Amino acid sequence: MREAIDLVSADGGSANGGDHAPRNTAAAIAQLQAIMADDVGPFRTKDKLLRASKGILALSRELGKRPPGRAAAFDMQRLEWFDLRNMLAVANAVTWSALLRPESRGAHQREDCPDMLPQWRVHKQVKRIGGEFDFTTVPVAADAKVLAS
């Protein structure tokens, strides 16, 4: 929690946290949307997902580690920075969850893995711990009841 408070109140200095040149947030969001639509949509392959992961990483690096400018009320540039930062985190979690599930299930089809695999009848849980994602699997509720009895 302290880390989040420090980030919100941080003085980013230059237009992009002193890390990079200023970035048009709307253009970055459009680029992220294109990456997700093209490579992480309902029809996926390992290659597309890896390409998406690289694109998301590049956008994250371009965004920088600190928000632009100084903390001030109603600073839309800072707000957009935090919005994009959160969008990139969710995009990364979705992409890696898909990479870690090498099968087709429901509306999401792996063109390189067209079959449903019984061992993947699980839920994926994603937690963010210290800036890193932790992926775990838990049984589907119906299976959990059978296992408990």
What are these regions (language model features)?
Residues 1-149:
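Glycine- and aromatic-enriched mobile tails/lids
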